[in-house]
């Protein structure tokens, strides 16, 4: 994902090495893979969607596993992308889509998200609900890895999707999709990616983790500076983690962001890596996550007290990173999901 930029920047800027950290970056195929590798001890930490904190700690849709999240990498960064076929059928917004759905009752329109415990799922549902569409009964929402979204849209397997960049811009570049909305239009400044850490690692290597947070704070500030964005897009394209070109990667980093149907927008707040105190796992972020899970029936009301307590434990760890100058080693990989 484009918003893995702080990890790439930290490596390219030599921040891991200069802070005495030995960090290995690995790219995984999907969020389910990251979850499984965390549970089975194959990962110490990961660049992950915020909702995985709650899913892992409560054992939702899988075994429970204690994790903490001392750092937020980014806010926003996603978009809704629909097929060109829907555009050709007159769809311009969710209200128009509702009319089309009503006129074709023999067809079940299908939309993709990267995880049910992610902002993408919440954003997709909010956009549908804006047009009076019931996400549970009027359409089908399926989970796919982000890197397959544009491809599945082009092959007609999806009518639309919500994903992070560069997959929306890739669909636009392929002339198979267009974007009616971005994160900021639906849920402004929502937490997107977090540093997800196994609790046992956090307890055993607290100083190393505090140093790592300090490194990421510096790399996030670098990524948020407008003058660094072109270089950042180049680094991402050269990293070997992306099939997308530097041109496609730059659309949400440098801009302008092209919606695929002749409308462009500035990208100043498309990705927020450091501004607005983005890196602090604040109480309002946890509250938002709980509210979304309750609204979308991912969390039974009976589990709400436990969920509040688990999030409080997970999001209050190491919120004041400091630099530790002694040499430290992180033996297992920091993982990003492409």
Question: What positions do the PLM features span?
Answer:
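Secondary-structure end/capping motifs
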Residues: 208-313
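Functional cores that coordinate and move charged inorganic groups
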Residues: 146-147
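Short, glycine-/small- and polar/acidic-enriched structural segments
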Residues: 1-136, 142, 159-171, 176-189
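Short glycine- and hydrophobic/aromatic-rich loop-to-beta-strand nucleating segment
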Residues: 80-81, 194-197, 201-202
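C-terminal non-catalytic accessory extensions
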Residues: 314-338
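Inter-helical turn/loop segments and adjacent helix faces that build the functional surface
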Residues: 134-139, 203-208
């Amino acid at each position: 994902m484009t918003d893995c930029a702080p990890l790439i920047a930290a490596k390219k800027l030599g921040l891991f090495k200069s802070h005495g950290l030995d960090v290995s970056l690995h790219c995984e195929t999907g969020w389910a893979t990251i979850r499984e590798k965390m549970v089975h001890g194959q990962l110490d930490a990961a660049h992950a969607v915020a909702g995985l904190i709650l899913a892992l700690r409560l054992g939702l849709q899988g075994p429970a596993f204690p994790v903490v999240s001392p750092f937020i990498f980014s806010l926003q960064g996603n978009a809704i992308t629909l097929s060109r076929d829907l555009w050709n059928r007159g769809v311009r917004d969710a209200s128009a889509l509702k009319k089309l759905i009503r006129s074709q009752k023999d067809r079940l329109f299908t939309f993709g998200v990267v995880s049910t415990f992610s902002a993408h799922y919440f954003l997709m549902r909010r956009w549908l609900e804006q047009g009076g569409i019931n996400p549970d009964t009027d359409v089908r929402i399926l989970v796919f890895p982000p890197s397959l979204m544009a491809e599945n849209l082009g092959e007609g397997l999806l009518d639309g999707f919500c994903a992070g960049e560069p997959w929306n811009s890739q669909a636009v570049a392929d002339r198979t999709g267009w974007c009616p909305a971005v994160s900021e239009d639906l849920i402004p400044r929502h937490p997107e990616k977090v540093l997800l850490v196994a609790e046992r690692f956090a307890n055993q290597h607290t100083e190393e983790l505090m140093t790592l947070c300090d490194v990421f704070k510096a790399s996030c500030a670098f990524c948020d500076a407008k003058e660094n964005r072109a270089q950042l897009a180049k680094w991402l394209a050269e990293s070997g983690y992306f099939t997308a070109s530097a041109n496609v990667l730059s659309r949400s980093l440098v801009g302008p962001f092209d919606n695929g149907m002749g409308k462009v927008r500035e990208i100043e707040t498309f990705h927020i890596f450091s501004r607005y105190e983005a890196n602090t796992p604040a109480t309002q972020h946890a509250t938002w996550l709980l509210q979304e899970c309750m609204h979308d029936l991912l969390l039974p009301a009976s589990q709400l007290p436990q969920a509040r307590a688990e999030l409080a434990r997970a999001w209050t760890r190491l919120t004041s990173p400091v630099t530790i100058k002694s040499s430290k080693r992180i033996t297992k990989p920091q993982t990003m999901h492409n």
